[in-house]
Amino acid sequence: MAPSHWRLILNGKSTDNADLREAVGTLRKRGIQLDVRVTWEDGDAERYVSEAVADGVHTVVAAGGDGTLSEVAAALAHHERDAATLPSLGLVPLGTANDFATAANVPITPLDALTLIAERVAQPVDLLRIDAEHGPRWCANVASGGFGTQVTVETDEGLKKMLGGLAYLITGMSRLGRIDPIGARFNGPDFSWEGEFIALGLGNGRQAGGGQALCPEAVIDDGLLDVTIVPALDGEVAATLGTLVTGGKQAALERVAVRARVPWLEIVSNQPLTLNLDGEPETSRHFRIACVPARLRMHLPNDCPLLGR
């Protein structure tokens, strides 16, 4: 039986979505007590989640892009309760790239996404906990660094609204001649690497930045963090970018990437390093990223590629 009381937290940029409004009405007619809260400024999602927990809501639905999903998931994870006693998590994809939803096969239409939540039992899912100079942060999908992070951070909001995921490609092309390598040391259980890199992916999920499959084999229920490092190899960068164009992004990654799968990873850099945590930048010289097993429960489709069990 579907949970009877849901709270949908809607990104304020999507308040004019007529399909979502109609879908909410349909679910209410099916007997779901479905409240809607709209985010306006920083901190709203966390406050709405706290209210939902206090009110005994069964399911919290993130309606927005990857950033909204991560913000709602992080707000749930901040509560010192285990997954079984927290509200379950649902997703209605309304963002520009919808990287998590795409990789997870979550339906893109609001009614189908809400129906999935009603029909599918929530599954345990992992989250990434990132400890840095400014305290702990949480990440639901992918933490990325290097070239891809700069593309995501620099992509204009207006361009994203007009062109969707194509905006990331245009911004990336404009940066091809100015890729600056970053030096860092990486250490985890049975894994160590040191050198300069141009791209980094730390995956709970598989893709970020408008379809970049940085961690193509990652699953979100194995308690492990997938690591992909693209080194700055002398004489290879131009060839790699050529492969990116002619053979596809994945072929380029497979050509040069260093990969690992670990429960946690420490990163130390002599210069400030910015990680993009599902759209939110965090800058530090020292990071510790841990995969926290089964931190939440989430409604996902039967054929979800991100579930390994």
Swiss-Prot record:
Keywords in alphabetical order: ATP-binding, Cytoplasm, Kinase, Lipid biosynthesis, Lipid metabolism, Magnesium, Metal-binding, Nucleotide-binding, Phospholipid biosynthesis, Phospholipid metabolism, Transferase
Binding, Mg(2+): V219, D222, L224
GO cellular component: cytoplasm; plasma membrane
Cofactor binding remark: Binds 1 Mg(2+) ion per subunit. Ca(2+) may be able to substitute.
Gene3D superfamilies documented for this protein: 2.60.200.40, Probable inorganic polyphosphate/atp-NAD kinase, domain 1 (3.40.50.10330)
Binding-site positions, ATP: T39, G65, D66, G67, T68, L69, S70, E71, T96
EC numbers on record: 2.7.1.-
Tagged with keyword Transferase: yes
Keyword Kinase: yes
Pfam assignment, any one: DAGK_cat
Cofactor annotation: Mg(2+); Ca(2+)
GO molecular function annotation: ATP binding; lipid kinase activity; magnesium ion binding
Annotated S-S bridges: none
Subcellular location(s) per record: Cytoplasm
Listed PROSITE patterns: DAGK
Active site: E280
Any GO BP: phospholipid biosynthetic process
Classification via InterPro entries: ATP-NAD_kinase_N (IPR017438), Diacylglycerol/lipid_kinase (IPR005218), Diacylglycerol_kinase_cat_dom (IPR001206), Lip_kinase_YegS (IPR022433), Lipid_Phosphate_FormReg (IPR050187), NAD/diacylglycerol_kinase_sf (IPR016064), YegS/DAGK_C (IPR045540)
Domain DAGKc: 1-134
Sequence similarity: Belongs to the diacylglycerol/lipid kinase family. YegS lipid kinase subfamily.
Task performed by this protein: Probably phosphorylates lipids; the in vivo substrate is unknown.
Name by which UniProt lists this protein: Probable lipid kinase YegS-like
Species: Xanthomonas oryzae pv. oryzae (strain KACC10331 / KXO85)
